[in-house]
């Protein structure tokens, strides 16, 4: 305790003595203390007198704890750490509260006040005047690392100002280091004490225990989270917003003290009724917010005249010049707005407006007096305005300096009663907004007028616009830019001076009309007063009433700017022209040509008369002087002059001019280019080019545009004979071109002229003339329409004739070429059976191709072989049949998936079928001499459209089953001898017929081709049956004996059939062809009763019979076992195919009905088609017993055959002969009750090709 009290006494002594603000902890003198460094602080450091330093050699440990840990920092006697060092303050802890020597000095309480009182009260250093108003960073940021100097580069302590050190923490740090006696003492500082130190160091901090980690900023009136770290306080202290608010608040407090006097801290606490100084200061700061804001606004409004307060609270203000709202709390925001370009421009305009208004008043007063004293009054008025101008902000031109005596405002004349305010430059005679006058003063045109002032009545006032002087007297050159038009009546720029429509619209506008009327009234008043004649233009003095409208440039402004006129006419121009040293360089304006327009792509300029393109200005100037251009312009003017001769000759001239312009377009090859304005006379729209006559006369000959397209066609068909319309056209403004046969959008006649100049229309018109379709150029409307129709028909006919001639020429060169019936741009190669485009390149390429050559050689070889060989051997025929049957075979999946109505067939099969149809048609063309017979055959082939895919599929299925049974029964010896097949007949015309019809069938769609083949097969089958019925003489059945016997329980019931009518005699096709069928007697009713079960027949040993063999598809095959084993010697019979009693035909139309459905490739049981219940019979030979054949296939795995008894007179020889010459082919169809009925037929073609 004694040591602590001694340390406190030493600290008190150091506190009383200002020279001992900072003491060294070492006993060495200043000269020998090489480790002491200069503290880089704003307040500076204090030099400690060595006589007052206690020599303490022991080191002292100061533990400054923070919330993060309890690590103690040991301060050696050779080091002087600071409390604000981050590495030290982070280890401070408030759990321990030992006595700290520098606490009393930090609280600055030498009078030992009571503990209950606030330690911050009555602190001399907390006076408002003594508060820090610094704007630079505080000392903590610089002193935090000032002691860490291992290189010894910092300066030593030499000079110290006692008044500069205000860092209480540094002072306490040094005093604590120097006041320690016991080196082992540990010093810790609680959190509350640390907040007191921070509040002492930064006067703007207010903190209570209830605030936690938050600190209240007195200057900013906000709470900040410092998180018990001094670096966060330091960061807020150096912010710009805090520093500016600090300046404002200290100024506010100073003004409060001057008006009310200083208030002590106790008075503040008593005022708010609290014992806490911090709480009282917070409440006081909140209560004076409005007063502080008003104080700031007074200062801001005094500093910035352009600023005005827009709201009673807050810091949002408005710029009265720019009318912009902004936040003006901080100085950089206000300075930034002051330096903006818009604010500076508005400020200059405002200053110039003020000066011009004052000068205008002084000038107008001087004009009312006598004319002799005008100069003296001007001199007297100048000194009065001078002081005001000297006080105003000088106007600085952006493009250079301006002389002090040069005031651009003298050329500005305000136009009254305008909002926004408009002004007029009296030098350039142009109107603009008041805010644009300064920019106008910097333009080249204005500078050029200043350097070389032009007289009012100069001949170049119109410039390049002189060509429109007769039509538009008000159009002159713009004073600023002569290349731009200018309306002298409305006093405004006219940007579209080269457009006739724009000039016309402006001349008819209400504004222009009113300005012209007011100008005429002003001229009349001026002439009555004797003031209007002095300003007349020499060029415009001899003009008519239209020319007088351009004289209002000066007379309109005689009332308000006579001072500018006197100055300009008197001494202003001469003085400026003589005293102005600066001359601006003026660039020559771009010359405009009235005949210049743009192309369709809007990229290239062309001459609308000559259709010549331009890429530079020199070419335009040369073209204007060319003889060709001059000639065409004269022709155009002549056509325009003819427009006023009357309505009788108007249509005729327009038609001639139209033809002339079209011929010129064709001559120069620029038909596709479109001019900006039509070269034709679009009199119905009023878009007439520049002409010399008055436009009022032209309005007498303008035809009104009808509202309907029919009316437009009636009006325009004299000029456009190809024009027509559709009665059923629903769209508006759509016409019809009879020559191009297209619909056109024609809102006006200009669009018709555009279409008339298109390349397609011109080409068709040339073709029409070339082929003899010359329309008569008469005014008669009916004759024009008739001639147009005839020309169109002849053009179409000529096109077809040309197509035929070109095809004939190609066929003469390429014998293999055939025209395509569907597309005139393609052809067909009959050798390769391919489709080619009619192009010379492709035709040559195909003719020289290897594939074409090989196909051609193969065709020649086949033709030679067919001509030399009279017959074909049976073996080759059988091989060909076998090869064809192998090619026709398809997989089981394809056949099962295939449906009756499906059209998807294999590509090879479809191509083969179409080739067969083409061969048939080609044979018909070659054999038939007459065209009618040829067309009838083609129609017959096309009408036979039905698919036979189902029939062929089922027949092949039965054939496969037969082959399987024959292979299983191969050990059985054959019992039926098969005679050799007859040699086929030589090739005849029917083969050629089928060869020619195949290409035609190929060209058909797949579904139509399949249906056609089916119908062809159906027709051939019916013809074959009729031929067999006609050629049948007497039945000669052959009985095949078998060793097997029927059981006693089995009975055979003959089936009687009604006689069938005999067909008419027909030409015999294959009279010598014979076929045989295998028939077995059985009950016919079993097939109709849907008995699908196989008959149970007791098996008996075969005693000596051999298996019967038949020819199926050209090959000898054994009879299936299930057929042979149920036949006896007197029941197994092979009948002649020609015998009609053994033939039963099922109509094929019943097999191809649309009501059938496909179930796994077979007919469903619910089909509606029925087969006849009784077979056909022919009683011509006297045979009353009919033979019935019926084969029912059940699930493709079994067959059931029934036979009937035939007379015993049938000869075996005929049966054997007929069996060997036939190929049984089975065809199936549904019975009446839905079961499957399979029939046999023969289709023998000895001349079939592979």
UniProtKB/Swiss-Prot annotation:
<dbReference type="InterPro" id="IPR051964">
    <property type="entry name" value="Chaperone_stress_response"/>
</dbReference>
<feature type="compositionally biased region" description="Acidic residues">
    <location>
        <begin position="553"/>
        <end position="563"/>
    </location>
</feature>
<feature type="compositionally biased region" description="Polar residues">
    <location>
        <begin position="132"/>
        <end position="141"/>
    </location>
</feature>
<feature type="compositionally biased region" description="Low complexity">
    <location>
        <begin position="1206"/>
        <end position="1224"/>
    </location>
</feature>
<dbReference type="GO" id="GO:0008270">
    <property type="term" value="F:zinc ion binding"/>
</dbReference>
<feature type="compositionally biased region" description="Polar residues">
    <location>
        <begin position="1104"/>
        <end position="1114"/>
    </location>
</feature>
<keyword id="KW-0677">Repeat</keyword>
<keyword id="KW-0863">Zinc-finger</keyword>
<feature type="region of interest" description="Disordered">
    <location>
        <begin position="642"/>
        <end position="684"/>
    </location>
</feature>
<keyword id="KW-0479">Metal-binding</keyword>
<feature type="region of interest" description="Disordered">
    <location>
        <begin position="1079"/>
        <end position="1116"/>
    </location>
</feature>
<keyword id="KW-0862">Zinc</keyword>
<feature type="compositionally biased region" description="Basic and acidic residues">
    <location>
        <begin position="851"/>
        <end position="860"/>
    </location>
</feature>
<feature type="region of interest" description="Disordered">
    <location>
        <begin position="1032"/>
        <end position="1060"/>
    </location>
</feature>
<dbReference type="GO" id="GO:0090053">
    <property type="term" value="P:positive regulation of pericentric heterochromatin formation"/>
</dbReference>
<feature type="modified residue" description="Phosphoserine">
    <location>
        <position position="975"/>
    </location>
</feature>
<feature type="region of interest" description="Disordered">
    <location>
        <begin position="343"/>
        <end position="398"/>
    </location>
</feature>
<feature type="zinc finger region" description="C2H2-type 2">
    <location>
        <begin position="319"/>
        <end position="343"/>
    </location>
</feature>
<dbReference type="GO" id="GO:0003677">
    <property type="term" value="F:DNA binding"/>
</dbReference>
<dbReference type="GO" id="GO:0005721">
    <property type="term" value="C:pericentric heterochromatin"/>
</dbReference>
<dbReference type="GO" id="GO:0005634">
    <property type="term" value="C:nucleus"/>
</dbReference>
<feature type="modified residue" description="Phosphoserine">
    <location>
        <position position="165"/>
    </location>
</feature>
<comment type="function">
    <text>Dose-limiting factor in position-effect variegation, the inactivation in some cells of a gene translocated next to heterochromatin. It could play a role in chromosome condensation.</text>
</comment>
<feature type="compositionally biased region" description="Acidic residues">
    <location>
        <begin position="657"/>
        <end position="679"/>
    </location>
</feature>
<feature type="zinc finger region" description="C2H2-type 1">
    <location>
        <begin position="217"/>
        <end position="236"/>
    </location>
</feature>
<feature type="region of interest" description="Disordered">
    <location>
        <begin position="107"/>
        <end position="148"/>
    </location>
</feature>
<feature type="region of interest" description="Disordered">
    <location>
        <begin position="160"/>
        <end position="186"/>
    </location>
</feature>
<feature type="modified residue" description="Phosphoserine">
    <location>
        <position position="176"/>
    </location>
</feature>
<feature type="modified residue" description="Phosphoserine">
    <location>
        <position position="175"/>
    </location>
</feature>
<feature type="compositionally biased region" description="Acidic residues">
    <location>
        <begin position="164"/>
        <end position="175"/>
    </location>
</feature>
<feature type="modified residue" description="Phosphoserine">
    <location>
        <position position="871"/>
    </location>
</feature>
<keyword id="KW-0539">Nucleus</keyword>
<feature type="zinc finger region" description="C2H2-type 4">
    <location>
        <begin position="487"/>
        <end position="512"/>
    </location>
</feature>
<feature type="compositionally biased region" description="Polar residues">
    <location>
        <begin position="1079"/>
        <end position="1091"/>
    </location>
</feature>
<feature type="modified residue" description="Phosphoserine">
    <location>
        <position position="873"/>
    </location>
</feature>
<dbReference type="GO" id="GO:0000792">
    <property type="term" value="C:heterochromatin"/>
</dbReference>
<feature type="region of interest" description="Disordered">
    <location>
        <begin position="851"/>
        <end position="915"/>
    </location>
</feature>
<feature type="zinc finger region" description="C2H2-type 7">
    <location>
        <begin position="829"/>
        <end position="852"/>
    </location>
</feature>
<feature type="compositionally biased region" description="Low complexity">
    <location>
        <begin position="543"/>
        <end position="552"/>
    </location>
</feature>
<feature type="region of interest" description="Disordered">
    <location>
        <begin position="1205"/>
        <end position="1236"/>
    </location>
</feature>
<feature type="domain" description="BESS">
    <location>
        <begin position="987"/>
        <end position="1026"/>
    </location>
</feature>
<feature type="zinc finger region" description="C2H2-type 6">
    <location>
        <begin position="737"/>
        <end position="761"/>
    </location>
</feature>
């Amino acid at each position: 305790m004694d040591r602590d009290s001694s340390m406190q006494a030493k600290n008190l002594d150091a506190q009383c003595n200002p020279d001992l603000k900072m003491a060294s902890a070492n006993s060495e003198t200043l000269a020998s203390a090489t480790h002491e460094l200069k503290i880089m602080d704003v307040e500076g450091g204090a030099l400690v007198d060595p006589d007052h330093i206690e020599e303490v050699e022991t080191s002292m440990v100061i533990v400054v704890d923070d919330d993060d840990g309890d690590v103690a920092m040991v301060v050696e006697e050779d080091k002087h750490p600071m409390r604000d060092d981050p590495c030290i303050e982070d280890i401070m802890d408030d759990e321990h509260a030992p006595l700290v020597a520098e606490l009393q000095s930090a609280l600055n309480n030498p009078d030992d006040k009571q503990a209950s009182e606030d330690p911050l009260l009555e602190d001399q250093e907390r006076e408002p005047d003594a508060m820090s108003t610094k704007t630079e960073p505080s000392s903590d940021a610089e002193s935090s690392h000032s002691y860490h100097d291992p290189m010894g580069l910092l300066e030593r302590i030499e000079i110290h100002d006692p008044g500069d050190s205000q860092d209480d923490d540094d002072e306490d740090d040094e005093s604590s280091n120097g006041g320690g006696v016991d080196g082992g003492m540990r010093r810790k500082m609680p959190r509350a004490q640390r907040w007191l130190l921070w509040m002492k160091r930064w006067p703007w901090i207010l903190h209570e225990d209830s605030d936690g980690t938050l600190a209240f900023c007195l200057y900013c009136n906000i709470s900040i989270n410092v998180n018990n770290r001094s670096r966060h306080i330091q960061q807020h202290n150096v912010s710009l917003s805090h520093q500016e608010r600090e300046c404002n608040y200290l100024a506010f407090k100073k003004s409060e003290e001057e008006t009310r006097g200083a208030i002590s801290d106790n008075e503040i606490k008593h005022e708010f009724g609290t014992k806490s100084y911090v709480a009282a200061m917070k409440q006081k700061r909140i209560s004076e917010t409005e007063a502080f804001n008003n104080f700031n606004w007074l200062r801001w409004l005094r500093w910035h005249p352009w600023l005005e307060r827009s709201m009673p609270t807050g810091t949002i203000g408005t710029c009265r010049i720019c009318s912009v709202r902004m936040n003006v709390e901080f100085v950089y925001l206000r300075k930034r707005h002051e330096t903006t370009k818009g604010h500076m421009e508005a400020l200059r305009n405002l200053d110039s407006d003020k000066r011009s208004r004052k000068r205008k008043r002084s000038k107008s007063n001087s004009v009312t007096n006598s004319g002799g004293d005008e100069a003296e009054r001007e001199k007297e008025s100048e000194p009065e305005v001078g002081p005001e101008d000297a006080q105003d902000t000088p106007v600085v031109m952006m493009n250079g300096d301006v002389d002090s005596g040069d005031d651009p405002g003298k050329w500005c004349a305000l136009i009254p009663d305008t909002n926004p305010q408009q002004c007029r430059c009296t030098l350039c005679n142009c109107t603009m907004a008041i805010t644009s006058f300064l920019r106008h003063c910097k333009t080249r045109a204005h500078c050029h007028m200043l350097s070389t002032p032009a007289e009012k009545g100069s001949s170049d006032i119109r410039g390049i616009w002189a060509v429109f002087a007769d039509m538009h007297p008000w159009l002159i050159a713009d004073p600023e830019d002569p290349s731009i038009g200018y309306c002298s009546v409305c006093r405004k720029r006219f940007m579209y001076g080269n457009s006739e429509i724009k000039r016309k619209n402006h001349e008819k506008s209400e504004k222009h009309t009113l300005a012209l009327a007011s100008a005429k009234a002003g001229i009349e008043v001026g002439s009555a007063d004797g003031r209007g004649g002095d300003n007349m233009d020499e060029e415009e003095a001899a003009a008519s009433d239209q020319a007088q409208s351009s004289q209002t440039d000066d007379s309109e402004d005689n009332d308000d700017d006579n001072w500018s006129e006197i100055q300009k006419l008197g001494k202003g121009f001469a003085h400026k022209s003589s005293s102005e040293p600066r001359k601006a360089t003026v660039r020559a304006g771009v010359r405009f040509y009235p005949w210049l327009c743009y192309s369709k792509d809007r990229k290239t300029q062309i001459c609308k008369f000559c259709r010549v393109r331009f890429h530079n200005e020199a070419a335009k100037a040369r073209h204007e002087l060319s003889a060709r251009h001059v000639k065409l312009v004269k022709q155009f003017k002549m056509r325009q002059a003819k427009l006023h001769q009357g309505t009788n000759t108007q249509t005729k001239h327009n038609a001639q001019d139209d033809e002339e312009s079209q011929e010129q377009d064709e001559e120069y090859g620029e038909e596709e280019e479109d001019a900006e304005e039509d070269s034709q006379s679009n009199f119905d729209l009023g878009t007439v080019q520049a002409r010399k006559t008055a436009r009022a006369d032209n309005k007498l000959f303008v035809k009104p545009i009808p509202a309907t397209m029919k009316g437009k066609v009636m009006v325009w068909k004299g000029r456009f004979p190809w024009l027509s319309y559709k009665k059923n056209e629903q769209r508006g403004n759509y016409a019809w071109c009879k020559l191009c046969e297209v619909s056109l959008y024609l809102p006006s006649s200009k669009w018709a002229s555009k279409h008339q100049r298109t390349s397609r229309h011109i080409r068709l018109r040339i073709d029409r003339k070339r082929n003899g379709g010359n329309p008569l150029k008469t005014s008669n409307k009916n004759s024009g329409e008739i001639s147009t129709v005839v020309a169109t028909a002849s053009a179409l006919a000529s096109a077809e004739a040309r197509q035929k001639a070109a095809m004939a020429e190609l066929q003469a060169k390429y014998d293999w070429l055939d025209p395509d019936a569907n597309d005139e741009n393609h052809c067909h190669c009959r050798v390769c059976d391919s489709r080619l485009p009619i192009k010379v390149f492709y035709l040559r390429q195909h003719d020289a191709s290897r594939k074409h050559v090989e196909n051609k050689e193969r065709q020649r070889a086949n033709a030679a072989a067919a001509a030399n060989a009279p017959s074909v051997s049976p073996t080759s025929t059988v091989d060909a049949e076998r090869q064809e049957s192998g090619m026709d075979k398809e997989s089981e999946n394809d056949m099962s998936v295939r449906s009756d109505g499906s059209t998807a067939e294999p590509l090879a099969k479809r191509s083969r079928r179409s080739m067969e149809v083409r061969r048939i048609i080609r044979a018909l063309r070659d054999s038939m001499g007459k065209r009618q017979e040829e067309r009838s055959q083609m129609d017959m082939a096309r009408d036979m459209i039905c698919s036979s895919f189902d029939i062929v599929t089922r027949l092949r299925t039965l054939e496969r089953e037969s082959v399987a049974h024959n292979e299983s029964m191969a050990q059985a010896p054959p019992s039926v001898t098969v005679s050799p097949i007859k040699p086929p007949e030589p090739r005849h015309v029917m083969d050629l017929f089928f060869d020619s019809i195949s290409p035609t069938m190929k060209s058909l769609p797949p579904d139509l081709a399949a249906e056609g083949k089916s119908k062809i097969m159906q027709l051939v089958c019916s013809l074959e049956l009729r031929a067999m019925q006609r050629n049948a003489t007497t039945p000669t059945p052959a009985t095949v004996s078998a060793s097997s016997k029927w059981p006693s329980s089995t009975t055979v019931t003959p089936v009687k059939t009604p006689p069938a009518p005999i067909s008419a005699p027909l030409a015999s096709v294959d009279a010598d062809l014979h076929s045989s069928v295998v028939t077995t007697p059985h009950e016919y009713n079993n097939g109709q009763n849907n008995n699908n079960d196989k008959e149970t027949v007791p098996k008996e040993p075969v005693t000596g019979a051999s298996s019967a063999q038949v020819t199926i598809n050209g090959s000898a095959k054994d009879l299936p076992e299930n057929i042979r084993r149920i036949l006896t010697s007197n029941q197994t019979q092979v009948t002649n195919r020609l015998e009609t009693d053994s033939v039963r035909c099922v109509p094929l139309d019943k097999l191809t009905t649309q009501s059938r459905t496909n179930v796994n490739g077979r007919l469903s049981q619910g089909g509606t088609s029925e087969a006849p219940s009784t077979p056909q019979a022919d009683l011509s030979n006297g045979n009353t017993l009919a033979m019935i054949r019926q084969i029912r296939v059940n699930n493709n795995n079994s067959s059931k055959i029934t036979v009937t008894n035939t007379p015993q007179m049938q000869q075996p020889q005929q049966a054997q002969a007929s069996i060997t010459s036939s190929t049984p082919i089975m065809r199936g169809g549904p019975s009446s009750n839905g079961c499957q009925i399979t029939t046999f037929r023969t289709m023998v073609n000895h001349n079939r090709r592979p």
